[in-house]
Amino acid sequence: MKDFTTYLSTAPVLTLVSLTAVAGLLIEINRFFPDALTAAF
């Protein structure tokens, strides 16, 4: 049961960290390529 409560306490933290990383990546992509319609990859 202790392992299950540890999982419940770490899953939201890992979710928050991963969502923050994805949001930061999207912000940086939009900073370097402001208009996605004209970005030539």
UniProtKB/Swiss-Prot annotation:
> Which parts pass through the membrane?
7-27
For this protein, the record's Pfam families field holds: PSI_PsaJ
Q: Which superkingdom does the taxonomy of this entry point to?
A: Eukaryota
Main location (coarse class): plastid
Please report the record's description of how this protein sits within the membrane: Single-pass membrane protein
Q: Kindly state a single biological-process term from the GO annotations of this entry.
A: photosynthesis
Q: What is this protein called?
A: Photosystem I reaction center subunit IX
Q: What organism does the UniProt record list as the source?
A: Chlorella vulgaris
Q: Which gene encodes it?
A: psaJ
